[in-house]
Amino acid sequence: MPSAIVVGAGVFGGSLALRLVSSGWEVTLVEQYPPGHVRAASGGESRLIRSAHGASSWYTRSARRALELWRELERESGADLFVPSGVAWFFSKPDGWGAESERVLREEGVPVERLAPEEGARLYPSFDGTGLDSILYEPEAGVLRARDATRVISEQAVERGARFVTGTAIPEGETVSVDGERLEADRIVWAGGAWLAGIFPGIVDLRVTRQDVYFFGAPAGWESPSVPAWVDFDGGVYGVGDLDGRGFKASPDSEGPDFDPDAEDRVPSGEKEREARAYLALRFPVLAGAPLVGTRSCPYSLTSDTNFLVAPHPEHERVWLLGGGSGHGFKHGPALAEYVQGLLEEKEEPDSVFGLGARPPGGGLRAPWIETS
């Protein structure tokens, strides 16, 4: 029986641990805090699950597969995780990323509709399409209860035989030290999220930023799944209908300030709140002046081109590094775990797109660059 240590029980690490133990591996899952904890990027209330990824058929297929696996996890665990609200994309131009997304979605057989701006009124109780060229609607997309999903993944992994260890992990060559206990396995995967770059300074190049989210009090009729989740691609704002009474979520999607996940307070920016409010007033007029009922800040960890990091350690052949998923982790986590399992079992070859080498700056939280077709 092959053995693995997975460090980090977020969506990447937890999904991999569950995948491996379900496939007959002996698995130890290490996490410094309880799964779904508020310090992590995987600890939020909701995450968009959608397949549109511009011209990238690889990411589109991965996201579609991940949704299948989330639904499978629901059936196996009995948990209610995915909310089929649909996702509406707002575009101000007829070509570019939106047009490429529509083309690839249709090629991959993913349901998608191209709507005129005025048709947004059938999706939302109050909608102003001023400045939009079109709406791209993914009816089978939706929202995942992220914190719940993270917890369920770890619970299922333990139920299937994984050992869960709580503590601070330190790399020691091809072993792991957890609060003085030395752990060994055939494969070690470090999936430390916002902490990964600090664990491997000089090897892992990730920028960690603080991303702020705002929840507004909305009248009846704005609940998810009654209204679709939404993304204004050119405006750089996204949101989710009121899920589980938390409030109507709206957040600017621009990269936030650099952030230390251990030392800094998680206090949302007043400037970003004003941007969110301005957008609500523009696009959903009835929500202008809606009261702020909640906030959250979470760390994002991003590579320079926003593709994932999936690479062997340059000095230790049994050690792998997995990260750079913030903004995309839940869209791909279970499917990426399948890919990583293939790498660990030497059934797949590492792809330089996800490697440790230099990457061109650019990309964006919504539109990763990728050369793999």
Please provide the spans of the model-predicted regions.
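Flavin-dependent oxidoreductases
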Residues: 15, 50, 57, 181-293, ...
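N-terminal Rossmann-like FAD-binding beta1-loop-alpha1 element of flavoenzymes
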Residues: 2-29
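Flavin (FAD/FMN) cofactor-binding and adjacent substrate-gating region
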Residues: 72, 90-166, 172, 302
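C-terminal catalytic lobe of FAD-dependent flavoproteins
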Residues: 284-373
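Dinucleotide-binding Rossmann-like beta1-alpha1 core, especially the glycine-rich loop
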Residues: 46-123, 236
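Conserved beta-strand-loop-beta-strand element in the redox core of flavoprotein oxidoreductases
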Residues: 171-183
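Glycine-rich FAD pyrophosphate-binding loop
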Residues: 22-42
